[in-house]
A protein has these predicted regions:
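Ribonuclease/tRNase effector modules and their secretory precursors
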Residues: 1-83
Length: 83
């Protein structure tokens, strides 16, 4: 999938609350005091998207960074951290 399509899919999934969270992401969110809604909002409004060598996207949103995978129509949040 091309960059523009991946970004569009990530933002749409975040807006529609169709994100899948790994157990690791949920644990990290709990530690950081983040919610599914705050992560979705950060992804929806993010402006920095970097494709990593492993095929996952490093996304810098307002107040947090998320690592996500775009898998066909699914957007999987692998981890979340602040900063």
């Amino acid at each position: 999938m091309k960059r523009r399509g991946a970004i569009r899919l990530i933002k749409k999934a975040a807006a529609d609350r169709r994100l899948t969270f790994t157990s690791h992401a949920l644990d990290e969110m709990d530690e950081e005091g983040e919610t599914r809604e705050s992560v979705a909002s950060a992804l929806r409004h993010a402006e920095s998207f970097a494709l990593q060598e492993n095929g996952r996207w490093r996304i810098h949103g307002v107040g947090l960074t998320a690592i996500v995978q775009v898998d066909d129509a699914a957007v999987i949040v692998w981890t979340v951290f602040t900063g």
